[in-house]
């Protein structure tokens, strides 16, 4: 009630309880254009901090009637912006935006025994990886971006050219050639 008495707008959001906090946690946040925390809110009243938000997987879209996928060589395009520019100028495609692309972030997970493994997360090209969300997604692991040493140990992972398929075969995935876990973030 103190926020109301002080005239401060606030939202109660679902939050990550952390390693010691138990299974449920809520935070009181005051919407502001500045600050370090982000949250989402639905018209139906659901509100959650970005690291604690849960969403349903999107419904599968039918590919029936769509043209077959085509692979394009994209030399020198190591960023989403350069892929978009290349697609719009060199390939004669309709107006492509970063939201039409998929980028891959390579994360290193270190467990309590200091065993390090990699995971590749695909997310829409117009979005950034939320560090807190990544930490919550992999409980029990220290999570950080893959290092140059990680890339050197995995020569199949070439910055700017990482994808689930390589040379027509499944490359990413625990049962694929690389044995590197592969996840998609649908939000």
Indicate residue ranges for each PLM-predicted region.
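Extended, low-hydrophobicity, polar/charged segments
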Residues: 1-187
């Amino acid at each position: 009630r103190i926020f109301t008495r002080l005239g401060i707008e606030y939202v109660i959001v679902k939050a990550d309880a952390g390693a010691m906090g138990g299974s449920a946690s809520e935070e009181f946040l005051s919407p502001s254009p500045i600050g370090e925390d982000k949250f989402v809110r639905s018209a139906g009243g659901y509100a959650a901090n970005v690291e604690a938000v849960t969403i349903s997987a999107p419904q599968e879209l039918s590919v029936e009637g769509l043209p077959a996928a085509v692979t394009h060589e994209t030399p020198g395009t190591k960023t989403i912006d350069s892929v978009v520019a290349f697609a719009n100028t060199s390939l004669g495609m309709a107006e492509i935006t970063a939201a039409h692309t998929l980028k891959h972030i390579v994360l290193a997970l270190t467990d309590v025994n200091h065993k390090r493994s990699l995971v590749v997360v695909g997310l829409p090209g117009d979005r950034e990886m939320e560090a807190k969300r990544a930490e919550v997604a992999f409980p029990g692991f220290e999570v950080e971006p893959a290092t140059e040493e990680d890339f050197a140990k995995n020569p199949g992972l070439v910055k700017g050219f990482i994808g689930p398929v390589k040379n027509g075969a499944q490359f990413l995935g625990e049962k694929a050639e690389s044995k590197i876990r592969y996840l998609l973030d649908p939000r």
